[in-house]
Amino acid sequence: MISRISVTTSPPKIFRLLYFEKSLHFNNYCRIIYYDNASVEGVMFMGESRHIYRCAVIGQAPMRFPWGFDEEDSGCRKMKIELAQQVMALRQRGVTQFLTACDCGVGLYAAEIVNGLRETTDPDLMLFCYIPHEEQATKWAPYLRERYFTMLEKCTHISVVCPVGTPDAQLQAYRKIIDLADVVLCVHDTDLSATDSGENRAFAFAVESHTPTLVLHPKELTAEWVGEQFYPRRS
């Protein structure tokens, strides 16, 4: 089991945790979780020079969906199925680490999808949860709060981005995972009028930073690349 570290301040300049485990798909290997000044985490296999591909998953707030928080709505069900399909497609393209900013909408949905895959078919998949602050779920509905803590319990790694009370902590968490990512998967309706929400600002940040961004339309269920596409480098 991977140790999890929760921080409210910047991590040490360099901290490394090495351990060995047996994998069903590989011989014994060494998994290195490392933290540098950019708080970059990764996994390397012993004897290999293997690039780690990370995907940040972001999306508009639930109240901006036609169904709001009603996850039993057929539209929400279809969107979550398509989100799962896109996660698996990115996995096929070499992404092994998925990063979420722990919001109560797309971030939570994606985390539950990744944790489900890890438990059933893909134990080498990893989920990294970047919490905006330690009281993130305090005011959430009880059923969402329960799922939030289950998500954290099952994930690979937890990191707290900001102290409690930091302005725009959710946006800072979005920016953090985008900075760490090779590709962004964003559930977003580009036809909606622009707002100053953290989700919209995060989407704009991903595009402006030239990170390959795959936009999944929540109603049309179409997926289109904004800017360049994601092409994994071959070792």
Where are the language model's segments positioned?
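Detector for intrinsically disordered, low-structure N-terminal pre-sequences
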Residues: 6, 39-42
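Residues at secondary-structure transition points
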Residues: 10-13, 36-37, 65
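Compositionally biased amphipathic helical and low-complexity segments enriched in hydrophobic
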Residues: 18-19, 25, 66, 217
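Short, positively charged and aromatic/hydrophobic N-terminal segments
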Residues: 19, 25-39
